[in-house]
Amino acid sequence: MKKIIFALLGVLSIASVANAQKKTSGAIQFETTIDPAAMMAASGVKIPEQMAARMPSSSKSNFELLFNATNASYMPVEETEDSNGAGGGGGGMGRMMRGFGGAGGNREYYYTFADKKLVEVFDLSDTTYVMQSGLKLNATAGLGFGGGMGRNQNPNDTTKPKPVAPPKIEVVKTDATKQICGLTCHEAIVKSTRSMKILDMDRDVTEETHIWYTTDLGFDFSPNPNMWTEGTVLAIEGRGNSTVAKSIEYRSVSNKDVTAPKKATPITEAEYKTKMENMMKRFRGNGNGRPGGAGGVVIRGFGG
């Protein structure tokens, strides 16, 4: 009888170890849903009527997280739809909205767990760049357009825009939990408060972003590196946008699928910022201050 019991315990132990090993690699599918008008309104951006008419009422993008015991990668899946039936098209505005998908846009993110490193790989001006990054909480570059982009701007005003004061950030961890893809997730609410002028009156406006994370997978990750508090983030929910894990499949993942390409050109955050500022100057000049103007410039992958 004792031998039978020990044999059963041995089988259960082996099964438990095998199951644990199985859950150290796999693929998680994410879906990002964006309501552009609500998203821009939440950031205080005044939308011209012509631009609003071209906006889809909602846009969906898909992303995939691949992970194994040592590395992970997060990148867009080539399948996008919007409520206007534009499929993968949607014109310039559709492409612009996809550039904000989960803050991933057309970027690829590569993680190494041992040293907690994160790099971003993206194309800009026909060149593939790689930039050192990291998980952090930075609501200024979070889910909204933020930064005063297009906010109450006069197209004929060539003066240097006034600096925008950074928002006040408060993180509230609640006792709430919910199941996402069979994993227990905990809630952290990020409250971002900034001063805005509404109807010629200065008011404090607070945006809330709900982050749902799990510690069951054993590694740190967020579909938006600027919206991370701890653990593996499986859902980010804000006004007018959300990114949520829809499914998880535990399977073998090769190292080459989660390793950054070696031929990309290195770029620092400061160099990237300078390039983007120069691009925005050309963008405003070509389009007379109108997003998506005559120059047709589309800027992808904000949130770096």
State where each predicted segment sits.
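Extended soluble regions of mature proteins
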Residues: Q21-G304
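Bacterial Sec-dependent N-terminal signal peptides
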Residues: M1-I28, F302-G304
